[in-house]
Amino acid sequence: MSDWGFEKTLGVVTALPNVALTAPRNVGLAHATLAPKMTLLDRFRGKGGRRLCVEALAAQRLVSGNRELAEDLADRAEVLAVSAGQTLISQGAEDNDIYFILAGTFDVVVSGRRVAGRSAGDHVGEMAAVQPAQKRSATVTALEDAIVAKLSAEVFSNLGSRHPQLYRLIAQELARRVLQLESRSIE
């Protein structure tokens, strides 16, 4: 904005909620237009948002490029914004949703000790989704503003019936994480 040299005018205009001033470089204020301010969440909603959501879900380890599964997930998931510092999952909690991380990064903490980081392409909450009697084994907190696709355990189970490879991929991911934790404990 400072490239345009009229910060004070922009400050007044952008005081409107969810509105941004857009104009090409070297164009006077008379040619600037008001446009809705795009949020990270907006990228995954509305026009073009579903396509981007499907692409992000297809890139998930659990989806492994399966376009049909990615579309099923996009149809059934609730896409949510998570603010930096917000806790997504609390250790010991009894909820059992699974979250696919579409954007952003998270810390995974067990009993006050950071054990892992998770980012776009990863998922969290699968243990409680697969075993509903299982309480949450970790606290997952956003390190930056993030976007997740949330599925209830029931919906995830139904998708697992239609796409049985999900359970094989979860088993592979859990095995990878166990090996990762074991290698850290040896160091």
Cite the ranges covered by each PLM segment.
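Cytosolic regulatory regions built on CNB/CRP/Popeye-like sensor folds
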Residues: 1-187
